[in-house]
Amino acid sequence: MSESERPEAGDGTDALGASPDTPLSSEDAAELEQLRREASVLREQLADAAGTIGSARSVRDVHQLEARIDSLAARNAKLMDTLKEARQQLLALREEVDRLGQPPSGYGVLLSVQDDETVDVFTSGRRMRLTCSPNIDTKGLKKGQTVRLNEALTVVEAGHFESVGEISTLREILADGHRALVVGHADEERIVWLAEPLVASADLPDGYDDDLGDDRPRKLRPGDSLLVDTKAGYAFERVPKAEVEDLVLEEVPDVSYNDIGGLGRQIEQIRDAVELPFLHKELYREYSLRPPKGVLLYGPPGCGKTLIAKAVANSLAKKMAEVRGDDAREAKSYFLNIKGPELLNKFVGETERHIRLIFQRAREKASEGTPVIVFFDEMDSIFRTRGTGVSSDVETTVVPQLLSEIDGVEGLENVIVIGASNREDMIDPAILRPGRLDVKIKIERPDAESAMDIFSKYLTDELPIHEDDLSEFSGDRSLTIKAMIEKVVDRMYAEIDDNRFLEVTYANGDKEVMYFKDFNSGAMIQNVVDRAKKNAIKAVLETGQRGLRIQHLLDSIVDEFAENEDLPNTTNPDDWARISGKKGERIVYIRTLVTGKSSSASRAIDTESNLGQYL
């Protein structure tokens, strides 16, 4: 039945089309009731189905909307990042354009700061009074500082002190403490301002020095090299000159008199000359005795001249500490070791300036009451007799400079000069006269007794000794070493054919055979012992037997003698003989006599017409 044909509920029929007034049978009534119940169930199911369909549709829509929102949010974030990056690039490009479009900046040297916060600046060759940018703290500006100027000549930035320029030598600091007299190129003198760091160094007390620490400032003193801007008229910093610092070695040597063998008499002489005046000044004043100003140690090479000079400084420091009641372990003295040949300089006046600086340094140290030893090694190389120069006459000005320092108007208190040379005959006589180098001590070659003393310094009880040698003296190490030394010295000083070294012929026709003992030295003895120790080490590696043997020492003597065979073969045997300590009649012929080697034939060498290099 169609919808139009179905009776309406409002026209007296029920939902199933039956009129309530129509009489029904019991069967029809039961069927009608059954249909009504089924319709009610279907109506409920229909309502439930409609609600389920609507709910599912709404959840699906929500998920779709959420997914779309997430996608839009991601796109939005990506666009934000892109915009931010583009903005940063635009800002960087704008800054780069602004930077490239800026006018050039100038630089100047700050001369002074005024009360109205303006500043005087030296720039472009002119002195100008300029204003400062508001972000510049004028109280923090320092004289001599580099400042940056903009196009309007306004100070916009404070920099560091200038680090390049000309080198000038400080002559003196003026009374105001802010200016100094310096000597520049070609001895041109000028007055310059001192930058604030140099003013602070100039104000340090006299005893203040940087020797106690690398980070501490050092007092500014005449002779220092300064970095100077001659146009601005400012000195910025002290520049240490390496060539001067290297020539002077300030140290307290650790060598004592006990380390020196075979020179007892010479040590006594130098102790009397150096230590007594320092330790007993009252007695010297009481007897009106003037202490010596200098000592000359002369003699052949390798005999201990430099060693004695070091021991003097060490002993003097300890004795002075005992007199003052100080701890001997903290004894202090200064040993200024001057390397003679390196003192020479090709520029006129530089050598003399170095000598002045050396003695100035010595006086500064001595003013504290500390003994100062100024040691000139190879003294003949720089203070030779005036007028004897072959290629130059530098000694004509260097020698007077030393004389004026030793015996000039300005005295030397607590300073003693020690010179060492193996050609004392070449040193200018004015230096050697009394009143300058008063004491002259000859360091001779060691004799047999001295050689035993020297050997005992190197052959000690701590050394490993071979069991076979120890067994000969019942295991007594001291007796074994003593016997080893005696045998070695007897072999070294024996006048046998194996020890013959040279046959020399003098100008008067006399001939003389010289043995190796005539050319022995402490350095040669040390070399012999070192060779023996090396042989003992090789024996351990080869045979496994440990310990030093007497045979090692005897073999070392033979090797040492053999190595010296060709040393006398020089172009000037007379000069070689003088250096070696053989003086007297002029030598014209030399013949080597080393056994086991091919002896050279007799050679006539004229020492007057054939001058050349010597050993």
Swiss-Prot record:
Residues 614-615 are annotated as: Docks into pockets in the proteasome alpha-ring. ATPase which is responsible for recognizing, binding, unfolding and translocation of pupylated proteins into the bacterial 20S proteasome core particle. May be essential for opening the gate of the 20S proteasome via an interaction with its C-terminus, thereby allowing substrate entry and access to the site of proteolysis. Thus, the C-termini of the proteasomal ATPase may function like a 'key in a lock' to induce gate opening and therefore regulate proteolysis. It comes from Mycolicibacterium gilvum (strain PYR-GCK). GO terms for biological process: modification-dependent protein catabolic process; proteasomal protein catabolic process. This is Proteasome-associated ATPase. Pfam families: AAA, Prot_ATP_ID_OB_C, Prot_ATP_ID_OB_N. Consists of three main regions, an N-terminal coiled-coil domain that binds to protein Pup and functions as a docking station, an interdomain involved in ARC hexamerization, and a C-terminal ATPase domain of the AAA type. Residues 25-102 form a coiled coil. Pathway: Protein degradation; proteasomal Pup-dependent pathway. Keywords: ATP-binding, Chaperone, Coiled coil, Nucleotide-binding, Proteasome. Residues 1-36 are annotated as: Disordered. InterPro entries: AAA+_ATPase, AAA_ATPase_domain, ATPase_AAA_core, ATPase_AAA_CS, NA-bd_OB-fold, P-loop_NTPase, Prot_ATP_ID_OB_2nd, Prot_ATP_ID_OB_N. The keyword ATP-binding applies. GO terms for molecular function: ATP binding; ATP hydrolysis activity.
